[in-house]
A protein has these predicted regions:
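Charged/polar, solvent-exposed surface patches and flexible loops
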Residues: 10, 54-61, 85-88, 136
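Conserved NAD+-utilizing ADP-ribose enzyme module
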Residues: 17-18, 25-49, 70-72, 81-166
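Short aromatic-glycine-(Arg/Gly/Cys) micro-motifs in beta-strand/loop hairpins
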Residues: 43-68
Length: 166
């Protein structure tokens, strides 16, 4: 998905209200490209991840239709501290990934929740647990501790500010 950054200089001069972090899912393809999709959970089969996503989407549609869909959003975090060793920052498919600071612009739907609910649902592998975790996830329940996940729809609302340098 490509974002058009027509007035880049003007944009950089504007006051930035809130910075979020976004990470590519592999080698960077273009200066303004944002990718979106499902999260990775180590040691889970593709079938487990796919079925969990289906259940989470079913629960969202049934009980939380105002929330952004995990299937059509960009995933962000407010800060990178605590994400080291977690799915946002480190799994084999992201060894070549880069992290970027982004700003949200325009009309968008933002939802903050605890990413651990999704991870636990995948790891347990049964539909009853997945439904229970999905409800907690979409309620935004629990403490975020280190796993605050931010979903933003549409993905085009996340505009790259600059590459994050450690």
């Amino acid at each position: 998905m490509k974002l058009l950054l027509e007035n880049w200089q003007e944009y950089l001069e504007e006051e930035i209200s809130k910075i979020y972090y976004w990470q590519t899912r592999g080698p960077w393809k273009s200066e303004s490209q944002i990718e979106f999709g499902v999260t990775h959970v180590p040691k889970a089969t593709p079938r487990q991840r796919d079925r969990t996503e289906e259940i989470f989407e079913e629960v969202r549609k049934e009980k939380f239709p105002d929330r952004p869909s995990r299937l059509n959003c960009v995933y962000l975090c407010e800060n990178l501290k605590g994400w080291e060793g977690k799915s946002f920052c480190s799994y084999p498919a992201r060894n070549n990934s880069e992290t970027y600071e982004v700003e949200l612009r325009g009309d968008y739907n933002l939802f903050k929740t605890n990413a651990e609910y999704w991870t636990e649902a995948v790891m347990r592998g049964d539909e009853e647990s997945a439904r229970s975790y999905a409800e907690a996830y979409w309620e935004g329940a629990g403490e975020y501790v280190t796993s605050l996940e931010i979903l933003v729809d549409p993905p085009e609302a996340a505009i790259i500010v600059e590459k994050y340098e450690e």
